[in-house]
Amino acid sequence: MSVAASRRAGSGFFRCPFHLSWRTLAPILVCTWSLAVSVQVFGGEPAPAILGVLDGEVKVIPPEGGVAKPASNGMTVTVGTRVQTGKKSTALVTFLDGSTLTVQPESDVTIKQADVGKKRSHVIVGVNVGTVWARVVKLVDPESTFSLQSNTATATVHDGLIGARQEPDNTFTCWTRAGDLWVLEPTGRARAILKPGQMDIVKAGAPSNPQAFFSNHSALRVETPVSVLPVILMPDRVRMAGFTDPDTDVNHVFGSYTGIDGEGQRVVEVPAGVSGPFTLILQGEQDGPFLIRIGALYKGVPVDQHQVSGTLQRGARLAAQLTLQLEGMTNDAKTAKVSGVMIGPLESTDLQLPGKVGVPENP
């Protein structure tokens, strides 16, 4: 096996990331957390979602109310359940249609509606406070919706990658990386329709003002041919974004992007305000040579770009450490400016991704 790397300059290296190719999967395998867990089903009817603890301690309040209790990894959650995260904890809610909701630290959400089916789904998540990130699968029925709701607005998408943040002062911010996002007022009137890469801030007395969205100013981006499955494991070695099989992508990283571009290339982009190291894992879907692209971006503009080539056999895996070079000294990951990416050698690996959870087929 041979691996070679080269560096390229110029802003035309990366292509527009906003073309998605989602496929409905039922049952679906979703890569989630560090232990394989079984889904609990009561009364013969599968609950609409399961809850995973990605990091720290997560608490739940059942629909009937009461005191918040520690959540268990893989427990079912039903309509009316509240999920709460602490300062250093992150939760993942996986719905039976394959859509996922990542609940960021210091957040509180309520599952208000979860009518989930093979061809049609209607999900509403109330964001009481904090930040959430959702990967919404595309279903056959064009009427299917996934909504993030606050007291002041509802952000609704058919499929894509969306997020929202609810502040204690009732300010509601929502954004989309993929998929048109409808921002509706409580009356049902459309306040705005956000295009991929846009955000809007809903605040009392302020008009809609869509603007560019960056979860972090800096980003790490990988492009591969369709014959190679890329996954980026974050420095915490818990969260990841990428492709775990030809038709399944996972996206647990707030502000990240996973999809297929207009030229059929697999694309993974994650926020990168820390040096890392990030771990890139490549899995072959067929025998033969490959050429991948790795680069760093600042506010959406490429600042460092590399090409890496090699050979890969079907089912084999290669891994490399990616370390980002940051300008100046800053403790703010959101505004840190990346200047380059250092790529370690691609080597054979038996490193396993952080576990899998099987979601039972929805009747």
Predicted regions and their residues:
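The N-terminal extracellular segments of secreted preproproteins, especially immediately downstream
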Residues: F13-R15, V30, T173
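Extracellular glycoprotein-like low-complexity segments
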Residues: P207-P363
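Low-complexity, charge- and small-residue-enriched intrinsically disordered regions
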Residues: P17-T24, D141-P142, F146
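N-terminal secretory signal peptides that target proteins for export/translocation
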Residues: M1-W22
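Bacterial N-terminal signal peptides
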Residues: L25-V37
